[in-house]
């Protein structure tokens, strides 16, 4: 266990801490079914501490208004994550059974590299713009300004599939927008989150409370507390549709903004004039991490007249899919536990329709999910020295 160098503590109010009651739980390696280590089991009391820190940081520090500070902090964070990538890679494979090959792509390295997109967006984004004064039957001429402001305290609840990717897709845009964040990690893959806390603790430009990490067992009490608490402004949740409904119901009591990425897989549709030998090669992606991914096609629709031909091609494809030890870089299938992810880009909005979700991650649209839009009307004769007359 010691060779993994995994972080077992929570990250609350700028410090790595044990759970308040000292409780821990085992992290089980799905490949060997042996205990790989332990991690802190956060309670409702720990959730309260994290929310108090996040609320205090948002209201009392300059995090939400100091763009330069956020850029420095996120640059430090990105560089710190790159520096620990080799340790983190071993931890991810041990806790999730994710084939190590995928950690050199979307399940680790490229997700960290995608922080650059948020940094570039933060550097160039117009948080304030003037709009034309079209006049009004009430009052005199005014300077009208549309301002984007950080939405507040964000609770991010992430799944065990592609944990590093989903963690970063939620927390980085939220932090870049000026929100403070409490990340509740999936109980099966806690080290994908605790490493974030360890690295954040070493970033001098993160004020205490800007980012917090909680790991817990699967009882549901901590999640229920976080989604219902009035100190929370935004909930970003990825998981099942059934749990998403409960999150939405809980959040509605205090009218929280709710972003839901829920269950749902689309079929691969093959038309009757397709070259099946080429078209069906893509069906092999369902084997990545045994199909445990929301973007992996688990259904295939082919013309009835070409059914037998399709089955023969698929049989040949699947016989050649490499599987086994996830530490072997040649394998794309490990044990049943965690997800592979494909077709993502940092600048491409991703999300569900209908019952598969609300809101978007990635791209400008994902960034703006964590901003509030306000319009200010400042009379033309308003004193220029007033704070209201100054740009954001």
What name fits each language-model region?
Residues 33, 70, 92, 178, ...:
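Residue-level signal for inorganic ion chemistry
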Residues 109, 114-124, 286-291, 331, ...:
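C-terminal segments
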Residues 234, 242-334, 338, 382-392:
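ALDH superfamily catalytic-core signature
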């Amino acid at each position: 266990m010691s060779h993994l160098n995994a972080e077992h503590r929570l990250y609350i109010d700028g410090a790595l801490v044990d759970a308040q009651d000292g409780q821990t739980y085992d992290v089980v390696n799905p490949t060997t079914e042996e205990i790989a280590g332990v991690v802190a089991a956060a309670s409702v009391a720990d959730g309260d501490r994290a929310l108090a820190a996040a609320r205090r940081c948002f209201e009392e520090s300059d995090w939400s208004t100091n763009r330069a500070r956020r850029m420095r902090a996120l640059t430090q964070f990105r560089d710190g994550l790159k520096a620990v990538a080799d340790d983190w890679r071993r931890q991810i494979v041990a806790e999730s059974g994710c084939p190590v090959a995928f950690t050199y792509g979307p399940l680790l390295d490229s997700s960290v590299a995608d922080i650059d997109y948020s940094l570039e967006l933060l550097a160039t984004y117009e948080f304030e713009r003037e709009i034309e004064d079209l006049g009004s039957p009430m009052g005199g001429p005014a300077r009208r300004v549309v301002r984007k402001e950080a939405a507040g305290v964000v609770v991010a609840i992430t799944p065990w599939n592609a944990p590093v990717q989903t963690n970063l897709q939620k927390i980085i845009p939220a932090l870049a927008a000026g929100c403070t964040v409490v990340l509740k990690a999936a109980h099966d893959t806690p080290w994908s989150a605790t490493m974030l806390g360890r690295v954040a603790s070493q970033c001098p430009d993160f004020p205490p409370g800007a980012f917090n990490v909680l790991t817990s067992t699967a009882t549901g009490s901590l999640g229920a507390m976080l989604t219902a608490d009035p100190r929370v402004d935004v909930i970003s949740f990825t998981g099942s549709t059934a749990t998403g409904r409960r999150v939405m119901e809980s959040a509605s009591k205090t009218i929280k903004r709710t972003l839901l990425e829920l269950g749902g897989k689309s079929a691969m549709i093959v038309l009757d004039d397709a070259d099946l030998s080429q078209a069906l090669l893509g069906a092999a992606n369902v084997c990545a991490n045994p199909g445990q991914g929301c973007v992996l096609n688990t259904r295939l629709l082919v013309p009835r007249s070409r059914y037998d031909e399709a089955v023969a091609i698929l049989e040949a494809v699947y016989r050649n899919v490499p599987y086994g030890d996830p530490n072997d870089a040649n394998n794309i299938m490990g044990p049943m536990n965690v997800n592979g992810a494909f077709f993502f880009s940092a600048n491409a909005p991703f999300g569900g329709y209908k019952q598969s979700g609300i809101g978007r991650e990635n791209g400008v649209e994902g960034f703006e999910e964590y901003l509030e839009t306000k319009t200010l009307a400042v009379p033309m004769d308003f004193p220029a020295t007033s704070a209201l007359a100054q740009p954001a």
